[in-house]
Amino acid sequence: MLPASPATIRRDITALEQAGKIRKARGRIFLEDIRKAPSYEMRDAMHDEEKKRIGKAAAALVREDDSIIIDAGTTTLALAENLRDRSHLSVITNSIPVAYTFNATNVNVFMCGGMLEDMALVDDDAVAFFASHQVEKAFIGASGVRGITGLTVVSPFQFAVKRQMVRSAREVYALLDESKFHIMGVNLFADFRELTGIITSKPITNERLLERLEQEHVKVIYTE
């Protein structure tokens, strides 16, 4: 063991805690599970320009008088920011940031109840809320893409809500920055056959995935 002063140890512990590798509680140090998804704040700062372009492209699909679902997430939030000036639009969401984006606008916002997890409301109440609605379009985020199968999410609580969102819309669009195609994910909540389209920023290079999307008639929309 290499010698280290108490000040050095405290400084290293603080750095590890700030990096999310450990947490302190009651005088003890615990390793964090590095497999869990990054926090909302961390995700919000990642791929920012990409998300803005995706949000703008998704907004072009929304018509006046549409009723839409906007999923929780930082990429879907970029869509909401592009819809603030719309009128006669109804938005159903489980996202606190999305709902707040439409504060003092002419957009009608309906928000579910539920347990708060990572700035999203989830649990059986949230699932039941979305089951009671049918909309024209749903705009969904994801933690990752599982091969040529479908979309995944880390949280089992968000899995159930996202699953119901997909069932509650006539058209379903996945908003995915390029990094999501390199993350396998845990809980599969949507098969590609259930999607109307994917909005992403860079060309998909996986030939097998492109073949599957073409087979299922899933539109791939690339941003400018």
Model-derived segments and their meaning:
Residues 1-69, 80-88, 102-107:
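HTH-adjacent hinge/linker in prokaryotic transcriptional regulators
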Residues 3-5, 18, 97-224:
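Conserved phosphate- and dinucleotide-binding cores of soluble alpha/beta proteins
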Residues 30, 75-78, 99, 146:
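Short, active-site-adjacent cap segments at secondary-structure transitions
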Residues 32-34, 73, 112, 142-143:
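Generic beta-structure capping elements
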Residues 42-49, 53, 74, 86, ...:
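Residues at secondary-structure transition points
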Residues 70-71, 93, 200:
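Short beta-strand scaffold positions
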